[in-house]
Amino acid sequence: MQVLETISDLREYRKNVKESVGFVPTMGALHKGHQSLIERSLKENFHTITSVFVNPTQFGANEDFSAYPRPLEKDLALCEKLGVDVVFVPKISEMYPYKSEQRLKLYAPKFLSHSLEGAMRKGHFDGVAQVVLRLFHLVNPTRAYFGKKDAQQLLIIQHLVKDLLLDIEIVPCEIVRDSDHLALSSRNVYLNAVERKQALAIPKALENIQQAIDMGEKACEMLKKIGLEILKNLEVDYLEFCNHKLEPLKIIEPTNTLILVAARAGKTRLLDNLWV
């Protein structure tokens, strides 16, 4: 496995690769969710490149950029064990050669980015668009793998690829959960034992909503009440029912409904969702 830190080294590697390339962009602190993305890429491509880059432009002023976990040696060991070909670990100065005021500005499409996470974290998806498009430009992958847990991010990236005519297949991958059903996240390490137990209300709420849908309930208002009752001991930022354009729904639309939740257990903000 090669660990590349510079754009010039990555370009030199990529220039000599003619077969299919799978790409798994990450911010590190890898867990079994990331592992599932890497394993799928390894199955579907001749070469797999993973990036580890904590992207400063997607963090807000009061967010945890400096505190974000960075266990690089552990991440590299996992990638090598899995059989990754290249891990790209650039410095901020590599990815952003100009100061903020000198950069070309990229903006995520407002119709997908203004609500939900975009409303809670101003500029977050603009930062995601900045880094993902830069990485796509450098890696030029055949396929790129993203988890469904960050559903709004996934929809935005799918839109950007189509809108900018990029020849990249975006592969959505299922949410990976721990044995207690909590969706895997790098931020789960912040939870103490009590908070983790409280956080289990999030997958429980989604499970109960799914059960109600299976029993015939289609009214989003009623389903939301079911979910909020289970989430009552958490600080809920939102529990919303949308179609795949993130437009609010009143009635469940089969194969075109996303149920998204963001809530805090202690100080840790957690996301989860259900694709119906």
Swiss-Prot record:
The catalytic residues are H34 (proton donor)
Where, by residue number, does beta-alanine bind? Q58
Q: Give the UniProt entry's GO cellular component terms.
A: cytosol
Q: Name one GO biological process term.
A: pantothenate biosynthetic process
Give the signal peptide as a residue range, or say none if absent.
none
Q: Name one GO molecular function term.
A: ATP binding
Task: Note the coiled coil stretches, chain numbering.
Answer: none
What reaction(s) does this enzyme catalyze?
Answer: (R)-pantoate + beta-alanine + ATP = (R)-pantothenate + AMP + diphosphate + H(+)
Q: Where does this protein reside within or beyond the cell?
A: Cytoplasm
Supply the alphabetized keyword list.
Answer: ATP-binding, Cytoplasm, Ligase, Nucleotide-binding, Pantothenate biosynthesis
Q: Does the keyword ATP-binding apply?
A: yes
| E.C. numbers | 6.3.2.1
Ligand binding ((R)-pantoate): Q58, Q153
Additional detail: The reaction proceeds by a bi uni uni bi ping pong mechanism.
| Subunit structure, as described in the record | Homodimer.
Function in brief = Catalyzes the condensation of pantoate with beta-alanine in an ATP-dependent reaction via a pantoyl-adenylate intermediate.
Return the similarity comment.
Belongs to the pantothenate synthetase family.
Q: What is this protein called?
A: Pantothenate synthetase
Q: What is the lineage of its organism?
A: Bacteria, Pseudomonadati, Campylobacterota, Epsilonproteobacteria, Campylobacterales
- Which gene is annotated as encoding this protein in its UniProt record? panC
